[in-house]
Amino acid sequence: MDAMTNKRLRLTLKTVRAFIFLGAFAALAAAAVFMTVILIAKYQGAPSVQVPQSTILYASDGSKLGETNYGEKRYWVPLKDMNPTIVKATVAIEDQNFYDHHGFDYKRMAGAALADLKAFAKVQGASTITQQYARNLYLEHDKTWKRKWNEAFYTIRLEQNYSKDEILEGYLNTIYYGHGAYGIEAASRLYFGKHAKNLTDAEAALLAGIPKGPSGYSPYVNETKAKERQKTIVRMMEKQQMISQKKADELIKEPLSYQPLNKQVSKRKAPYFYDNAMRELEKKLGMTREQIETSGLNVYTTVDKRMQRIAEETITETVNAGSDIQVGFSAIDPRTGNVLALVGGRDYQKSPFDRTTQAKRQPASTIKPLLYYKAIQSGFTPVTLMKSEETEFQIDAKGETYSPSNYNGYYANKPITLLQALALSDNIYAVKTHLFLGTNKLVKTAKEFGITAHLQALPSLALGTEPVRPIEMVNAYAMLANGGKKIEPTFISRVTDAAGHVLYENPNQHKQVLDEKAAFVTASMMTGMFDIDLNGYTSVTGRTIANRLTRTYAGKSGTTSADSWMIGFNPKLAAGVWTGYDKNSTIDSVEEKSYAKTIWADFMEDALKGEPETAFKPPKGVTGVYIDPETGYSSGPGCAAKHYTYFVKGTEPANVCYGAEPAKQTKDRLPSKEKPASEKKWWDKWLGRHH
């Protein structure tokens, strides 16, 4: 009996020793694993806490234009820019011991495990704020052991490398609050239409309850349930002595008013402008569209919301709703190149294709001011005379000819001045000028004005047969308005990252690239399209809208069978309109042919309403005299016609009109400039000049 007892005792002691040994070994192994994890975490250092954030675009007045979010609305804000109650409420309901543990709340974990065992189900969570933050940053929300291991590993790394406030700030900026809102700032805007720092304490307490289950605790889904959870949170704050009982009662009783959910989904403002701003961002920052849309950038654009609204409303009010005709519109500040308003089509939802910046259309006669700028620079003056008559131009020695015509087949059948030729849009005068200068000159001049299209040096180029982008034509006119300084259409003035660091700022430096005197004289002549005193064999091209205008503008219209243009400016604003059909169908309706001019005139008047009149100021080297616009003579005593016209100093007309009938002009009177020898033979034949 004793032998059996001793044997059992020895066996029991061996078993106990074995368990002690195995327990000690397991403890050492666990400690070794734990220390290894700690050391690896320490070696790897701070994990990245970068998360996708919404990029916001602002209008020139600082108001919000739009945002990009890739489906996740997220705006990072520091703790100091949150109502303190959101912090207290979140800690109270999610992790009471947050400031005391090192990432894991072991007591809470044990309690949760015991509760789960009793219920034979997962009934209580034990994840700390740090664990949830790690899960939000790095992990998928599956329930595998691998995910649990990685969560623990990232939790350790976060606790090792970031302060409690940094972890809490990150958590509050990444947790999901429902309806696409990630982070407390997005949630504040979504539910209450305000910034997180402006939340009331009651609103903050309600929001703190949503992340546990956005599909159940969102007030949009179940307001009663959301209020019940808010009450639970407030009482927990009271229990943890974060607030008094009186304060708790007040918060529970406070009525809450929510933003209507349907207001959160709205049409993007100025969508065509928005797309151009995004394209410019890609170019300026060297980033992909996805990088831009998820980097939390603050993009300050150039759009003037008032002018944008005027442009959109003017187009809608002018164009017949039943017509399929399209419109491209842009307005530019000549002083900076800033695009103030842009419309790329009549309905962005139906067609996001931008007819202002992406399409190329024949500019027609709107190209003529660029030609005449070069002519003035080359010795022409506003009173240079050339005959307007039906003309067949011999292009080369092979006998090829070019026979342009004037609108409706009207001709003066006598010499007219450059001033009048521009106001009446005489095509014969334009082609003669183009050929006299050399067809390559207009190609080079267009490049100086910022035209990027490849233009062919054809005789017809003077009449705008080579397609260009409408916005580049408006920009070219803006360069005439600013006296010849180089500008480019600009959509973005400044970009900062989420922390406020400047990533890009438009330098706003503009080099003088055009002849200032020639640019001013050209701009001055362009005011003639609205001046009925310049009527001749036909009316000035702006006669139909002259009575709509209350200011001095310079401008030029243009027409092809499929395109209708109007571009014009004053010193502060340049704007242009193109109308036509996407498939190049002809514009047959008289009403549709008038759209471009009407839209331009009404926009300019409304956009500048309340602004002081700004005069075109001549630069040094330019002088003004009164002339007879038909003969080109200076207006002396007794001369009936008097039109104030600017000239490059020294090129004013020598002849004077005294009222008597002047000698009839029958030949072209061109600058006494020697032409290239290659042009002399055919030019002399039709020009009637002899050497």
Swiss-Prot record:
Organism name: Bacillus subtilis (strain 168)
Side Cytoplasmic, residues: 1-19
Phenotype of null mutants: No visible phenotype; due to the redundancy with PbpF. Spores have normal heat-resistance, cortex structure, and germination and outgrowth properties.
Ranges where the record places region Disordered: 663-691
Catalysed transformations (reactions): [GlcNAc-(1->4)-Mur2Ac(oyl-L-Ala-gamma-D-Glu-L-Lys-D-Ala-D-Ala)](n)-di-trans,octa-cis-undecaprenyl diphosphate + beta-D-GlcNAc-(1->4)-Mur2Ac(oyl-L-Ala-gamma-D-Glu-L-Lys-D-Ala-D-Ala)-di-trans,octa-cis-undecaprenyl diphosphate = [GlcNAc-(1->4)-Mur2Ac(oyl-L-Ala-gamma-D-Glu-L-Lys-D-Ala-D-Ala)](n+1)-di-trans,octa-cis-undecaprenyl diphosphate + di-trans,octa-cis-undecaprenyl diphosphate + H(+); Preferential cleavage: (Ac)2-L-Lys-D-Ala-|-D-Ala. Also transpeptidation of peptidyl-alanyl moieties that are N-acyl substituents of D-alanine
Family of this protein: In the N-terminal section; belongs to the glycosyltransferase 51 family. In the C-terminal section; belongs to the transpeptidase family.
A Pfam family matched in the record: Transgly
Biased composition (Basic and acidic residues): 664-691
E.C. numbers: 2.4.99.28, 3.4.16.4
UniProt KW Membrane keyword: yes
Matching InterPro entries: Beta-lactam/transpept-like, Glyco_trans_51, Glycosyltr_51/Transpeptidase, Lysozyme-like_dom_sf, PBP_transglycosylase, PCN-bd_Tpept
Parts of the chain that traverse the membrane: 20-40
Family annotation (Gene3D superfamilies): Biosynthetic peptidoglycan transglycosylase-like, DD-peptidase/beta-lactamase superfamily
Keywords in alphabetical order: Carboxypeptidase, Cell membrane, Cell shape, Cell wall biogenesis/degradation, Glycosyltransferase, Hydrolase, Membrane, Multifunctional enzyme, Peptidoglycan synthesis, Protease, Signal-anchor, Transferase, Transmembrane, Transmembrane helix
Localization of this protein: Cell membrane
GO MF, one example: serine-type D-Ala-D-Ala carboxypeptidase activity
Gene responsible for this protein: pbpG
Active site: residue positions: 94, 365
Signal peptide coordinates: none
Name of the protein: Penicillin-binding protein 2D
GO cellular component, one term: plasma membrane
Major site of localization recorded for this protein: membrane
One GO process term, biological-process aspect: regulation of cell shape
PANTHER family: BINDING PROTEIN TRANSPEPTIDASE, PUTATIVE-RELATED (PTHR32282), PENICILLIN-BINDING PROTEIN 1B (PTHR32282:SF11)
Annotated region described as Transpeptidase, given as residue ranges: 327-605
Residue span of region Transglycosylase: 55-223
Pathway linked to the protein: Cell wall biogenesis; peptidoglycan biosynthesis
